[in-house]
Amino acid sequence: VATVDCSEYPKPACTLEYMPLCGSDNQTYSNKCNFCNAVVDSNGTLTLSHFGKC
């Protein structure tokens, strides 16, 4: 199972680097920062499905 450490999040701003991750909500997040901010917003219900686009 793929995991991402989101302990340093949320962050107020994310970089524009493109390293897509696919969330359990079937949405593609452009990078770890955007994904982790969404995880925090979801109170931990959002998880990583896999690396790369959904």
From Swiss-Prot:
Glycans are attached at N43. It comes from the Eukaryota. PROSITE patterns: KAZAL_1 (PS00282), KAZAL_2 (PS51465). Residues 4-54 form the Kazal-like domain. The keyword Phosphoprotein does not apply. It is found in: Secreted. GO terms for molecular function: serine-type endopeptidase inhibitor activity. The keyword Glycoprotein applies. Transmembrane segments: none annotated. PANTHER family: OVOMUCOID-LIKE-RELATED (PTHR47729:SF1), SERINE PEPTIDASE INHIBITOR, KAZAL TYPE 2, TANDEM DUPLICATE 1-RELATED (PTHR47729). This is Ovomucoid. The lineage of its organism: Eukaryota, Metazoa, Chordata, Craniata, Vertebrata.
